[in-house]
Amino acid sequence: MITIDIELKDKPGELLRVLTPISKYGANVISIIHSREEKRGGKVPVRIVIDVDDKDKLKKILEDLEKEGAIIKKIDGKDKKVYLDVVVIGHVVDTNVRDTIDRINEIGLVEDLDLIMPHPDKESSAMMRIIVDEDKIEELFYLFEELEKEKGLLFIKSIF
């Protein structure tokens, strides 16, 4: 048995959509816990316990779950995704914020962005919520260093 902890958008039909890949690859659903009372940031935590007979099928199920928009948090209690809150200080907008986001999205996903622009001549700041695979954190931190040098920005990281 495999326990998969995911997060889904809090809207009708999301749970049904993630059950399709499980069925498609012949896995059996043992249990589902849909914790709406623990909703955070418009996302609902869901724990699905499945019985699947080989690792290739599990890999395909996980890939399809992500294609369906599920954020896979843990597999059998092991972290798969890490959330980072990153404060970016500098001329965030003037140094092409779209490019910065696109480059981060090649490694992880900028899930949320709050931008503060006090005055066009002054530095701005942004708070980014980034979701990244645990094994790609070092690559993301290296990108932050590149962006700091290239764009004169400062990235302040917080992992949870």
UniProtKB/Swiss-Prot annotation:
InterPro entries noted in UniProt: ACT-like_dom_sf (IPR045865), ACT_dom (IPR002912), ACT_ThrD-II-like (IPR044561)
The cross-references to Gene3D superfamilies, in alphabetical order and at most eight, read: 3.30.70.260
Domain ACT, which positions? 3-80
Give the highest taxon in the source lineage.
Answer: Archaea
* CDD domains per UniProt: ACT_ThrD-II-like
Q: What is this protein called?
A: Uncharacterized protein MJ1601
